[in-house]
């Protein structure tokens, strides 16, 4: 009897989405980039901590750039050419993440700042005295 080799690997489904959303959450400690389609279904994500940056290095602009490039390289097979960028948070990785999207070769259609602004809601954290 001949032994039959079976492969249980799934084939990659190549979808042609064309247009998507990129959400950049830039906090003081980390940067998280999520790529979704127009309906809001998440396709890929990456964070500075997941990319190997630890401690204070997570909040650098270079870490945000590498994170954005990694998240967009994951969705290269989906055929996304145009993106809408939504930025949330006060972190310093905001601008460098947007520049990384442009350097990858994707066309940025719009940039929106969706940082939540309180109308005198919760009491803020105490100011640091260094």
From Swiss-Prot:
It comes from the Bacteria. GO terms for biological process: translation. One of its GO terms (cellular component) is ribonucleoprotein complex. The keyword Nucleotidyltransferase does not apply. It holds the Pfam family Ribosomal_S11. GO terms for molecular function: rRNA binding; structural constituent of ribosome. Keywords: Ribonucleoprotein, Ribosomal protein, RNA-binding, rRNA-binding. Belongs to the universal ribosomal protein uS11 family. NCBIfam families: PRK05309.1, uS11_bact. Part of the 30S ribosomal subunit. Interacts with proteins S7 and S18. Binds to IF-3. Located on the platform of the 30S subunit, it bridges several disparate RNA helices of the 16S rRNA. Forms part of the Shine-Dalgarno cleft in the 70S ribosome. This is Small ribosomal subunit protein uS11.
């Amino acid at each position: 009897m001949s032994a039959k080799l079976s492969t249980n690997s799934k084939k990659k489904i190549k979808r042609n989405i064309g247009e998507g959303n990129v959400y950049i959450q830039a906090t003081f400690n980390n940067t998280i980039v999520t790529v979704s389609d127009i309906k809001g279904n998440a396709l890929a994500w990456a964070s500075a901590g997941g990319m190997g940056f630890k401690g204070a290095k997570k909040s650098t602009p270079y870490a945000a750039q590498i994170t954005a490039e990694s998240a967009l390289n994951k969705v290269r097979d989906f055929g996304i050419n145009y993106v809408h960028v939504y930025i949330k948070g006060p972190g310093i990785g905001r601008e460098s993440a947007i520049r990384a999207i442009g350097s990858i070769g994707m066309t940025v259609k719009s940039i929106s700042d969706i940082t939540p602004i309180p109308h005198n809601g919760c009491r803020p954290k105490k100011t640091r005295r260094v």
